[in-house]
Protein backbone atom coordinates (compact mmCIF):
# COMPACT_ATOMS: atom_id res chain seq x y z
CA UNK A 1 0.00 0.00 0.00
CA UNK A 2 1.41 3.41 -0.97
CA UNK A 3 0.67 4.96 2.42
CA UNK A 4 3.33 2.64 3.87
CA UNK A 5 5.94 3.32 1.16
CA UNK A 6 8.46 6.11 1.66
CA UNK A 7 8.76 8.87 -0.94
CA UNK A 8 11.55 8.03 -3.39
CA UNK A 9 13.78 10.34 -5.37
CA UNK A 10 13.48 9.76 -9.12
CA UNK A 11 16.50 9.35 -11.32
CA UNK A 12 17.26 12.53 -13.29
CA UNK A 13 15.46 12.78 -16.62
CA UNK A 14 17.28 12.91 -19.95
CA UNK A 15 15.25 15.97 -20.94
CA UNK A 16 13.04 18.44 -19.05
CA UNK A 17 10.09 20.11 -20.77
CA UNK A 18 9.05 23.03 -18.59
CA UNK A 19 5.65 24.70 -19.16
CA UNK A 20 5.99 28.49 -19.18
CA UNK A 21 2.55 28.85 -17.57
CA UNK A 22 2.17 26.63 -14.51
CA UNK A 23 -0.46 28.68 -12.71
CA UNK A 24 -3.62 30.67 -13.29
CA UNK A 25 -3.03 33.98 -14.98
CA UNK A 26 -0.76 34.95 -17.82
CA UNK A 27 2.59 33.44 -18.72
CA UNK A 28 5.63 35.44 -17.67
CA UNK A 29 8.15 36.90 -20.10
CA UNK A 30 10.80 34.38 -21.18
CA UNK A 31 14.28 35.56 -20.12
CA UNK A 32 16.40 32.75 -21.65
CA UNK A 33 17.18 31.77 -25.23
CA UNK A 34 18.13 28.56 -26.97
CA UNK A 35 21.73 27.65 -26.15
CA UNK A 36 21.79 29.40 -22.75
CA UNK A 37 23.24 27.49 -19.80
CA UNK A 38 21.07 27.53 -16.66
CA UNK A 39 21.47 26.27 -13.13
CA UNK A 40 18.75 24.79 -10.97
CA UNK A 41 16.63 27.68 -9.66
CA UNK A 42 17.64 30.15 -12.39
CA UNK A 43 14.66 32.11 -13.69
CA UNK A 44 13.31 31.00 -17.07
CA UNK A 45 10.60 33.65 -17.06
CA UNK A 46 10.07 37.02 -15.41
CA UNK A 47 6.83 38.02 -13.75
CA UNK A 48 5.21 41.12 -15.20
CA UNK A 49 2.53 41.51 -12.55
CA UNK A 50 0.84 39.92 -9.57
CA UNK A 51 -1.29 37.44 -11.56
CA UNK A 52 1.63 35.68 -13.21
CA UNK A 53 4.48 33.79 -11.60
CA UNK A 54 8.09 33.33 -12.65
CA UNK A 55 9.15 29.80 -13.62
CA UNK A 56 12.59 28.48 -12.66
CA UNK A 57 14.90 25.81 -14.07
CA UNK A 58 14.40 22.40 -12.41
CA UNK A 59 18.04 21.39 -12.99
CA UNK A 60 21.26 22.63 -14.54
CA UNK A 61 21.80 22.27 -18.28
CA UNK A 62 21.31 23.90 -21.66
CA UNK A 63 18.16 25.42 -23.14
CA UNK A 64 17.55 23.15 -26.14
CA UNK A 65 14.27 24.57 -27.43
CA UNK A 66 11.61 27.16 -26.75
CA UNK A 67 8.35 26.44 -28.50
CA UNK A 68 4.96 24.78 -28.51
CA UNK A 69 4.57 21.34 -26.96
CA UNK A 70 1.61 19.32 -25.70
CA UNK A 71 0.79 20.81 -22.32
CA UNK A 72 0.56 18.61 -19.19
CA UNK A 73 -3.16 19.30 -18.99
CA UNK A 74 -6.24 17.20 -19.64
CA UNK A 75 -7.08 19.39 -22.67
CA UNK A 76 -4.16 17.98 -24.63
CA UNK A 77 -3.63 21.41 -26.21
CA UNK A 78 -0.23 22.84 -27.04
CA UNK A 79 1.32 25.57 -24.94
CA UNK A 80 4.64 27.40 -24.82
CA UNK A 81 7.31 25.32 -23.12
CA UNK A 82 11.08 25.44 -22.54
CA UNK A 83 13.11 22.28 -23.13
CA UNK A 84 16.28 21.79 -21.06
CA UNK A 85 18.96 19.18 -21.76
CA UNK A 86 20.46 18.47 -18.33
CA UNK A 87 24.22 18.34 -17.78
CA UNK A 88 23.88 15.70 -15.04
CA UNK A 89 25.35 17.99 -12.36
CA UNK A 90 22.04 19.29 -10.97
CA UNK A 91 23.87 22.41 -9.74
CA UNK A 92 21.96 25.13 -7.91
CA UNK A 93 22.38 28.81 -8.64
CA UNK A 94 23.73 30.91 -5.79
CA UNK A 95 21.14 30.91 -3.02
CA UNK A 96 20.58 33.29 -0.13
CA UNK A 97 18.63 31.47 2.58
CA UNK A 98 16.86 33.45 5.27
CA UNK A 99 18.18 32.28 8.64
CA UNK A 100 15.34 33.85 10.63
CA UNK A 101 12.14 34.81 8.79
CA UNK A 102 11.22 37.15 11.67
CA UNK A 103 13.94 39.56 10.50
CA UNK A 104 11.82 40.26 7.40
CA UNK A 105 8.51 42.04 7.08
CA UNK A 106 5.44 40.08 5.96
CA UNK A 107 5.53 42.12 2.73
CA UNK A 108 9.14 41.04 2.06
CA UNK A 109 8.20 37.41 2.67
CA UNK A 110 5.28 37.72 0.22
CA UNK A 111 7.69 39.09 -2.41
CA UNK A 112 10.05 36.17 -1.81
CA UNK A 113 7.17 33.69 -2.15
CA UNK A 114 6.09 35.39 -5.39
CA UNK A 115 9.64 35.45 -6.78
CA UNK A 116 9.98 31.73 -6.03
CA UNK A 117 6.99 31.07 -8.32
CA UNK A 118 4.99 29.22 -5.67
CA UNK A 119 1.44 28.40 -6.76
CA UNK A 120 -1.36 26.59 -4.97
CA UNK A 121 -1.71 22.87 -5.64
CA UNK A 122 -5.41 23.10 -6.47
CA UNK A 123 -6.66 22.89 -10.02
CA UNK A 124 -6.54 26.65 -10.59
CA UNK A 125 -2.94 27.10 -9.43
CA UNK A 126 -3.44 30.54 -7.88
CA UNK A 127 -0.25 32.41 -6.91
CA UNK A 128 0.38 31.52 -3.25
CA UNK A 129 1.45 35.05 -2.32
CA UNK A 130 -1.94 36.38 -3.44
CA UNK A 131 -3.82 33.83 -1.37
CA UNK A 132 -1.73 34.68 1.70
CA UNK A 133 -1.86 38.46 1.16
CA UNK A 134 -5.65 38.36 1.21
CA UNK A 135 -5.58 36.98 4.75
CA UNK A 136 -2.77 39.03 6.33
CA UNK A 137 -4.07 40.85 9.41
CA UNK A 138 -7.61 39.51 8.93
CA UNK A 139 -7.28 35.91 10.07
CA UNK A 140 -7.03 34.59 13.60
CA UNK A 141 -7.35 30.87 12.83
CA UNK A 142 -5.19 28.93 10.39
CA UNK A 143 -6.55 25.59 9.21
CA UNK A 144 -4.01 23.21 7.71
CA UNK A 145 -5.92 20.77 5.50
CA UNK A 146 -3.99 17.53 5.18
CA UNK A 147 -6.85 15.52 3.70
CA UNK A 148 -6.42 13.84 0.36
CA UNK A 149 -9.14 14.41 -2.24
CA UNK A 150 -9.27 10.72 -3.23
CA UNK A 151 -9.13 7.65 -0.98
CA UNK A 152 -6.10 6.08 -2.71
CA UNK A 153 -3.97 9.21 -3.08
CA UNK A 154 -1.34 9.21 -0.34
CA UNK A 155 1.31 11.73 -1.42
CA UNK A 156 0.26 14.39 1.12
CA UNK A 157 0.05 11.74 3.84
CA UNK A 158 3.63 10.62 3.12
CA UNK A 159 4.95 14.19 2.96
CA UNK A 160 3.35 15.01 6.31
CA UNK A 161 4.97 11.94 7.86
CA UNK A 162 8.39 12.46 6.32
CA UNK A 163 8.66 16.27 6.30
CA UNK A 164 6.73 17.26 9.42
CA UNK A 165 9.40 19.67 10.70
CA UNK A 166 9.44 21.62 7.41
CA UNK A 167 5.64 21.76 7.40
CA UNK A 168 5.55 23.10 10.95
CA UNK A 169 8.16 25.73 10.05
CA UNK A 170 5.99 26.77 7.08
CA UNK A 171 3.02 27.08 9.43
CA UNK A 172 5.10 29.33 11.71
CA UNK A 173 5.92 31.54 8.73
CA UNK A 174 2.25 31.74 7.73
CA UNK A 175 1.29 32.66 11.32
CA UNK A 176 3.85 35.45 11.29
Question: What residue ranges belong to the model's regions?
Answer:
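Iron-sulfur-associated redox domains of electron-transfer enzymes in respiratory
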Residues: 52-176
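Short histidine-centered loop motifs in beta-beta connectors
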Residues: 28-37, 41
Amino acid sequence: ESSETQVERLEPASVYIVPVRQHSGDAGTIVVKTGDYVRKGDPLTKSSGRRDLPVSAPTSGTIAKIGLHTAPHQSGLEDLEITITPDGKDEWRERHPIEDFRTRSPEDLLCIIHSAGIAGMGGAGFPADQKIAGAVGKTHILIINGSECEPYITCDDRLMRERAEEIVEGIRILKY
